[in-house]
From Swiss-Prot:
Superkingdom of the organism of origin: Bacteria
Pathway: Cofactor biosynthesis; (R)-pantothenate biosynthesis; beta-alanine from L-aspartate: step 1/1
Cofactor needs: pyruvate
The protein's name in its UniProt record: Aspartate 1-decarboxylase
InterPro entries (UniProt xref): Asp_de-COase-like_dom_sf (IPR009010), Asp_decarbox (IPR003190)
Residues at which substrate binds: 53, 69-71
Reaction it catalyzes: L-aspartate + H(+) = beta-alanine + CO2
Any one GO cellular component localisation term in the record: cytosol
Entry's family note: Belongs to the PanD family.
Cofactor binding note of this UniProt entry: Binds 1 pyruvoyl group covalently per subunit.
Record organism: Dehalococcoides mccartyi (strain ATCC BAA-2266 / KCTC 15142 / 195) (Dehalococcoides ethenogenes (strain 195))
EC number(s) stated in the UniProt entry for this protein: 4.1.1.11
Length: 124
């Protein structure tokens, strides 16, 4: 199940020579309930790529979103990304589970934090 989402963060750097991962501002990690070394999916809004990596903690308040290692080939400074964390939960907990959603501005400052995803009623 979706546990955490940082919506439309801006990549601040891409470091190809680093070992690998995504560096995320500690404040964003805490708001989204992401832990160091936790596996995440990163969806690049600009080019449509989707990658799987793990989180390392960046300085609190820095706004840092940095793709590292091979992941740096999947995005560039200025690209918008959606960062998704998942968790396993019991079937019983699926009835009440709500993910942590973090919305940011162009400098990766938190603008809103909420739980749950709005449903859309699609008429056929």
């Amino acid at each position: 199940m979706l546990k955490s989402k940082i919506h439309r963060a801006t990549i601040t750097d891409a470091c190809i020579d680093y070992e690998g991962s995504i560096t995320i501002d500690k404040n964003l990690m805490q708001a989204a309930n992401l832990l160091p070394y936790e596996q995440v999916h990163v969806v690049n809004v600009n080019n449509g790529t989707r990658l799987e990596t793990y989180v390392i903690e960046g300085p609190a308040g820095s706004g840092q979103i940095c793709l590292n290692g091979a992941a740096a080939r999947m995005g560039m400074k200025g690209d918008k990304v959606i960062i998704l964390g998942y968790s396993l939960i019991t079937e019983e907990d699926t009835l009440t589970h709500q993910p942590n959603l973090v919305y940011v501005d162009s400098l990766n400052r938190i603008t809103k934090v909420k739980n749950g995803v709005a449903s859309r009623n699609l008429e056929v």
